Regions:
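The substrate-binding groove and active-site-proximal loops of carbohydrate-active enzymes
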Residues: 12-36, 86-107, 265-279, 295-305, ...
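Active-site region of glycoside hydrolase catalytic domains
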Residues: 123, 134-272, 321-324, 388-395, ...
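Active-site neighborhood of glycoside hydrolase catalytic domains
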Residues: 262, 267-336
């Protein structure tokens, strides 16, 4: 098994060149990226960067408040943000029309993107969200019929809504109870404010485009009371409280008719039993539909909320027809890792609860170092404990420093500056053969500190709002100008330009990881245990290891400290025996290797 490198890209934001997007701005004001923006030069850049796969996030048609760009608005009371959550799927057999230049040809445009991706030598990963769908699944847009979509009965279309649970139902119901959404009172307040033409009100539920339309009418015709009422009446379905009777269970296992503000109230929970049902068959049909279109893999959302038996069945069935399709699981319970790989059949698992959490604790301790002792959970020794826990599962773990759920490394809430990430990057990328994932803009040091709307200033790049990101715009400019190769290869100091410094380091590291045999498929040897007493080595803040393949041996050292470190590292006799390394006058157990590592950084030394 060699080392996949996955680039997660969010097309809605990636291709958006709007210079000054408005907080909670509408699609009309803030714009959106398109399928076409992921053009051949972009894909050539990703291939040059060392990527093997592109995870296109936010492709499947989801609920949205917007009415432009070919969109049909869902009820705003349950939609999060102006654009809506990409994980509240409204139609599994469709793609978002706003991503297409011609919404009527949206599926053709996505198929063209798949073709461009394959032509660039890259593989396509798509989301599979098996646990939940939007509250209005199948009620807004029609299924697009095509090869593999036979039996496209809507989820829930034939459910018996008079019972709470039935093995034949796709959802859970609460007969005699109506849904009460957490923002119901605020929604009514917003409607009263809009009715009274209070345009100073902070609207966050009623769609921005509708508020803008009402404001424009009131400005142009301030005395036309009847006309204003008529305008509101046109949108009565969006301005009346959302009705759902019987209420349905909410996506995050909230089995209640009254979900809370922190629940996934924009979604409804799918009903899986421990054995085959019609729900299983419908979800298989969805996967097969996209596999037939050329999708090479699926990132499976919130796997632990769905019975493992379903995944074992569906993965086996899909792979019997499409053996090369890969399945990646978003999982968080480390004690289930072995089951999901060895029994269920996933190809890769998130190691968020393992290596990511370990590295984050180490980084945060050193970035915010106040001179206090290092607790065990903040120590670099945790890296050793994590790989020892994983054992033979290491190559199946998906390593990352960022994704859409986590805060950007450079945000105020994590590492504060992307240049503080290099030590962690070296471990996450170079430690073993495990796949690595990069989140779009990460290679530019994107900070995620915009206040976009539904997403506040939380250190994440929004997935709920129409938005444009400055660092990503500058990256796209580098790609369109073809300057990225020159910038990466240049030796001119760029310390005064943090973005270029980060880009140079990340691009070089990723390309090396993709091309070097020792990193792609080599053996790992952890040097920390034998260097606890070595001069300059701090087991809590330093991590050292070897990667070896055939005639090549590399030494890596990460320094998580905020201070430069010089250390004398020894390579034990056991390492020479284990890796089959030849000894020499300059390389032997008695000859310590002097290494100097800048603060929060990593170095690589070629030994053989």
């Amino acid at each position: 098994m060699e080392k996949p490198i996955i680039y997660q890209i969010f097309p809605r934001v990636w291709g958006n060149d709007t210079q000054k997007p408005l907080k909670r701005g509408s699609l009309e004001n803030n714009g959106t990226g398109k399928f076409r923006d992921i053009d051949s030069p972009t894909l050539e850049y990703l291939k040059w960067l060392g990527c093997s796969h592109v995870w296109y996030t936010g492709i499947l048609r989801h609920s949205t408040k917007s009415s432009g760009g070919g969109c049909l608005p869902s009820h705003p009371e349950f939609v999060k943000g102006e654009a809506g959550s990409p994980y509240a799927i409204e139609n599994y057999y469709d793609v978002n029309p706003y991503l297409a230049t011609d919404p009527d040809r949206r599926m053709e445009e996505f198929e063209d993107l798949i073709g461009r991706t394959h032509a660039a030598g890259l593989k396509v990963i798509l989301d599979f969200v098996p646990n939940h769908v939007s509250r209005d699944y199948g009620k807004v847009s029609p299924h697009l019929n095509g090869p593999g979509s036979s039996g496209t009965v809507y989820l829930g279309e034939k459910d018996d809504r008079t019972v709470h649970w039935s093995a034949e139902n796709d959802f859970f119901y609460y007969p005699g109870q109506s849904l009460v959404l957490p923002d119901a009172d605020e929604f009514r307040k917003e409607y009263r404010a809009l009715k009274n033409k209070d345009f100073g009100y902070d609207y966050r539920i009623i769609p921005a485009w509708l508020v803008d339309r009402c404001r424009a009418f009131a400005t142009d015709s301030p005395e036309d009371v009847r006309g204003y009422r008529s305008l509101l009446a046109q949108y009565d379905s969006l301005l009346s409280p959302y009705e759902e009777t019987p209420a349905m269970a909410t996506g995050n296992n909230c089995y209640s008719a009254i979900p809370g503000i922190n629940d996934w109230y924009e979604t409804v929970k799918l009903n899986y039993t421990d054995s085959y049902t019609g729900t299983w068959e419908k979800m298989y049909g969805i996967l097969r539909y996209w596999a037939l279109k050329g999708v090479d893999g699926f990132r499976c959302d919130m796997v632990e909320l769905v019975p493992a038996g379903f995944f074992k069945w569906v993965i086996g069935r899909i792979k019997s027809e499409f053996p090369e399709v890969v399945f990646i699981a978003e999982v968080y319970k480390k004690d289930l890792y072995r089951k999901y790989i060895r029994e269920v059949g996933f190809d890769y698992l998130y190691d968020k609860s393992g290596l990511y959490d370990t590295l984050r604790a180490i980084v945060e301790k050193n970035v915010n170092d106040n001179g206090m002792p290092v607790d065990l959970w903040q120590s670099a020794t945790g890296i050793t404990r994590n790989w020892q826990f994983l054992g033979d599962l290491q190559p199946y773990m998906l390593n990352f420093l960022e994704n859409h759920d986590e805060q950007r490394f450079a945000s105020d809430f994590f590492g504060k500056d992307a240049r503080n990430s290099f030590a962690a990057l070296y471990v996450s990328l170079f430690l073993n053969r495990a796949p690595f994932m990069l989140y779009y803009g990460e290679e530019m040091g994107e900070r995620g500190m915009d206040e976009e709307g539904f997403s506040g200033k939380d250190g994440r790049t929004t997935i709920f709002d129409w938005w444009s990101v400055g660092s990503v715009r500058r990256l796209r400019k580098m790609i369109s100008d073809g300057r990225y190769m020159e910038i990466a290869a240049s030796e001119t100091p760029v310390e005064e330009d943090a973005e270029l410094e980060v880009f140079r380091r990340y691009s070089r590291a990723l390309k090396f990881a993709a091309e070097d045999p020792a990193v792609r498929k080599g053996t790992v040897y952890d040097l920390c245990y034998c260097n606890f007493s070595s001069d300059g080595f701090d087991k809590n803040r330093h991590f050292a290891w070897l990667r070896d393949h055939e005639e090549e041996t590399l030494l890596f050292v990460s320094n998580f400290s905020s201070r430069e470190a010089t250390m004398e590292l020894m390579i034990p006799e056991h390492a020479f025996e284990w890796l089959g390394m030849p000894m020499s006058e300059d390389l032997n157990p008695q000859k310590h290797i002097r290494v100097t590592v800048p603060p929060m950084d990593g170095v690589m030394i070629r030994l053989l």
